[in-house]
């Protein structure tokens, strides 16, 4: 594929952790945009 994906710095822990957090945050933001009622439970 791309040469950048095989470099050593791309596979380092801070880069992988940053990408993982960004992807997780994006999924949560989009999920809460379409289904916002699951964030708050007024009956509890």
From Swiss-Prot:
Transmembrane domains' residue ranges: 9-29
GO BP terms in the entry: photosynthesis
InterPro entries assigned to the protein according to its UniProt record, in alphabetical order: PSI_PsaJ, PSI_PsaJ_sf
Compartments (UniProt record): Cellular thylakoid membrane
Keyword Metal-binding: no
Alphabetical UniProt keywords: Membrane, Photosynthesis, Photosystem I, Thylakoid, Transmembrane, Transmembrane helix
UniProt GO cellular component terms: photosystem I; plasma membrane-derived thylakoid membrane
Membrane topology, from the record: Single-pass membrane protein
SUPFAM superfamilies: Subunit IX of photosystem I reaction centre, PsaJ
Family statement drawn from the similarity comment of this UniProt entry: Belongs to the PsaJ family.
Task performed by this protein: May help in the organization of the PsaE and PsaF subunits.
Protein name: Photosystem I reaction center subunit IX
Gene transcribed to yield this protein: psaJ
């Amino acid at each position: 594929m791309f040469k950048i994906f095989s470099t050593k710095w791309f596979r380092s822990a801070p880069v992988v952790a940053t990408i993982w957090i960004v992807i997780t945050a994006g999924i949560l933001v989009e999920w809460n945009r379409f289904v916002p009622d699951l964030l708050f439970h007024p009956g509890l």
